[in-house]
Amino acid sequence: MSDATRARIIAIANQKGGVGKTTTAINLGAALALEGQRTLILDLDPQGNASTGLGVDARNRDLTTYDLILEDTPLAEIIRKTSVENLWIAPATTDLSSADIEMVANENRVFMLKDSLANRATKDFDIVLIDCPPSLNLLTINAMVAADAVLVPLQSEFFALEGLSQLMLTIREVRQTANPALRIEGVVLTMYDQRNNLSRQVEDDARETLGDLVYATRIPRNVRLSEAPSYSIPVLEYDPASSGSQAYMNLAREMLDRHLATA
Ligand code: ADP
Ligand code: MG
């Protein structure tokens, strides 16, 4: 990393639920960690699926991202090591579902996460991946304000691109106000099915509209990806040879190559 005092922060966002945000956070995180990047997944979804999927028991989440944002608890006190070397998680619980409302009252409301990550709080990491909730609410805005870039998982399904224009509008608004330097890291096609016309159609449309922003790597629909969370491990540990594992390793490498090329 060029700036050793803090990590590169990437918000994984899409206001649609079930498009692969959490799956991407867990498995891209694990893949980056295997590539030697010290990686933190910051769970910003009250459902806490990334936390559960990485083995943080719901009964064992004393300090969470809620405390980070609303109680000024230092990041170092809430992070947990995962089963993967170089991979940590800042867990979330349902507490976070009320955070949105509590944050509205604060005049600093869109900068609360950014402030929590200031003062070299992320200096021990190379990359922080923020798993956003399925909404363009204040939590997601906080993630975009704190982030260097947004990574967008795009489900290879009908209507995928319609939701995207709303997301792009929000990114533009954040740029015009609280975070002018916010970039789009890239758009990754998820749950891709080579044999399905619709998948190919979504891919063609996405590449035509978004050009190089769309990663060459596509994440295939792979049952191993949906099974791994019930074992509390990333697919790279559950089934390293699976197509899902291979795809997330390829995505990690593509991301790192791109970054090195533009650094
Ligand atoms: P989001 O975080 O955007 O709501 P998830 O990552 O939780 O989406 O994915 C929604 C569901 O789809 C989960 O059950 C997950 O296991 C499954 N899933 C995600 N990506 C894939 C994939 N590439 N292949 C098969 N199942 C997937
Ligand atoms: Mg999720």
Predicted regions located by residue number:
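P-loop NTP-binding core
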Residues: 1-263
